[in-house]
Amino acid sequence: MALRIEDKKAIVAEVAEQVSSALSAAVADYRGLTVNQMTSLRKQARESGVYLRVVRNNLARLAIKGTEFECLADALKGPLVLALSKDEPGAAAKLFKNFQKDHNAFEVKNLAMSGELFGPEKLDDFAKLPTREEALATLLNIMQAPVTKFVRTLNEIPSQAVRVFAAVGDSK
């Protein structure tokens, strides 16, 4: 069924709004998937905070125009599903990677982040990106390490003095 111009404008506006707040994007070919498999993918996307939409390529091009994901414009060919990571930069890649394990017909085409276009070979790298909490925990550990080491060194001085006095006392 053909879309009316109002419907097309609404779709472009919705996708453009989601793109404006996205951290990363992934595009995949969904040919060969059943309706139940696509429904499962959509459910997993909702659970992981990923915006997922099957959108016509021309409408997607209009939605990403002027954004950091404009680099995807030339990659939009054929029937594609667009996934946008909203909270975590690697969420869409993780979703696609996990889904691709069980569904051979599902093929990731491109990934984009910070205005750069990446091929499907970078899917594993994107999927391994830490969550915000993991990144903050790592940063905190790095920042605490010198302080912790300094405190241990300060505590070692009185401990050594006590051991020296104990050794002197034992020798007499």
Swiss-Prot record:
Disulfide bonds: none annotated. The keyword RNA-binding applies. Keywords: Ribonucleoprotein, Ribosomal protein, RNA-binding, rRNA-binding. GO terms for molecular function: large ribosomal subunit rRNA binding. The keyword Metal-binding does not apply. Pfam families: Ribosomal_L10. GO terms for cellular component: ribonucleoprotein complex; ribosome. GO terms for biological process: translation. Part of the ribosomal stalk of the 50S ribosomal subunit. The N-terminus interacts with L11 and the large rRNA to form the base of the stalk. The C-terminus forms an elongated spine to which L12 dimers bind in a sequential fashion forming a multimeric L10(L12)X complex. Belongs to the universal ribosomal protein uL10 family. Forms part of the ribosomal stalk, playing a central role in the interaction of the ribosome with GTP-bound translation factors. This is Large ribosomal subunit protein uL10. It comes from Francisella tularensis subsp. holarctica (strain LVS). The lineage of its organism: Bacteria, Pseudomonadati, Pseudomonadota, Gammaproteobacteria, Thiotrichales.
